[in-house]
Amino acid sequence: METKTILRSISFNDIDSDSTITESPEARKTLYNRSLSGKGTQRSRISPGDVENNFSIKPLTFMKEDDRYKMRIWKPVCENEHAKEFLALLLGDGTYQAALKLQKVYRSFRTRRRLADCAVVVEQRWWKVLDFAELKRSSISFFEIEKQETAVSRWSRARTRAAKVGKGLSKDEKARKLALQHWLEAIDPRHRYGHNLQFYYHAWLHCDSKQPFFYWLDIGQGKELNHERCPRSKLYQQSIKYLGPTEREAYEVIIEDGKLMYKQSGIVLDTKEGPPDAKWIFVLSVSKILYVGMKKKGNFQHSSFLAGGATLSAGRIVVDDGVLKAVWPHSGHYLPTEENFQAFMSFLRENNVDLANVKKNPDEEDGEAPAKVKRMPSRIKETEEEHCDFVDAETGFSPNTKPNNHAELQTLSRFHSKLSRLDEIPDEDDNMIEEEQDDEEEPETPSEQGYETAEETFIAEEEFTYPKSNLFDEDIEDYEKPVLKEKIMRRIDSHKGIKSYQLAERLHSRWSTGAGPRISCMRDYPSELQFRVLEQAHLSPRASSNSSKISPFAPVRTRGTSLGRSPLAEELENL
């Protein structure tokens, strides 16, 4: 029986690979000579014979006490001085180790950004699937509808049209809009404030670029865009800290003898510490673990504790030397309901906390009273759109340029007709709709910490339900297998029964780190869409087997030119 030895090659190239050593001695000499040459090394000083005779790799076997498995490492043994110098460079040089670490960190971030773009692209593909299903539904056979569709049925279908991740079926427009912001914030590799990301996401939706959103925003055609409502400096400055499992232990609070104290340090909780205007927030996890910390606007908020994960309750808290003084449900991220708040009250009673003198409503001086604003009209219906100085680098058109071709006019006409169905069943409050302040956590003045009010930042919800049809090329999607109607209805039905706007509640997977939302968002879609998008982003092992198929993200092999290459493919080969 022939034994093969698996070695990981050390390379300065972009991709490391596992290889099985079965080459001839001549090939091994060439490999060693190339590996030991490097930049600045004189190849003539090291002959293949010296390496073959003086440089070898021998395995050392480490046995665990329970003898369940073996762990083998490879120890280099050499006598040649030049080989020793090369190994010392690899194993001991601080500059090389720092460069290697930097390379690994960048590659890790690049993978996270690609996965975030996959979450955006699969969402756009879901729009296309719904379009296809709606066309088939009009022919009755797809959904097996025997009776003529009623106005109520059309109303239900129009709402289903917007059944996206983070967007529910309720008429609470503010909650849906906030859910979109939280979705963007959660999947962003940098976890930039979703309130700020929404402006750039809106610009991306309405521009002509075919690049995926986060690539477009950071290094693509949109990297020069400086939105007047949210400058680049503010976008990068306000990034939300998502705690990992170890980090959040410092914020875990336990209750002993009716007093709140930090579990790790044993220090009694006192919210009077810190600045006079400091605001303290809490979340109660689904496993009934309480976390409390000081809120930092644009950096640390309710979603920080559990990395945007699911909670039982969230809100504001006031504690004086371990004694609970006030608590109320207020979180722009989780939007706690009365049921959530009562769950927290039950938790406190179970831990023998005296609630007799505890305030359950904010004081007016706390600035928590909800402000009322009138909903601004849809920007789609405005005759004069907001001016945007961004011009697409590839096409030369502004995102707000009116469509000048038949296909774009058809898309807009179809989208407007869908929105017009919303008037078929009038609401009681159509004459005047008042909503709470649309800031992430609580209303503030425009000058306070650089945040704007709802009236200044409001973008109509319809602007975000606009499908970016130019993201995909119709003529290269013939090879794609259609999504089964059972899977389409299964996902729609699964979202119909969810009343919460928490992203974690609308997804079936659970997570504990900042990478979790990106993975969970992908898993929420039918497997056909998942594999299709991952293959296009070169994040699926199936991509190599389907390399012969044309893909909007796959590179087109050309000589002497980069035409036809997708953004992700160019980045993969150039970086």
Swiss-Prot record:
Compartment(s): Cytoplasm; Nucleus
Organism lineage: Eukaryota, Viridiplantae, Streptophyta, Embryophyta, Tracheophyta
UniProt tissue specificity: Expressed in roots, rosette leaves, stems, flowers and siliques, and at lower levels in cauline leaves.
UniProt protein name: IQ domain-containing protein IQM6
GO terms for cellular component: cytoplasm; nucleus
Principal subcellular localisation of the protein: cytoplasm
The keyword Cytoplasm appears for this protein: yes
Organism domain of life: Eukaryota
Induction / repression: By salt stress. Down-regulated by treatment with mannitol and lead.
Organism, scientific name: Arabidopsis thaliana (Mouse-ear cress)
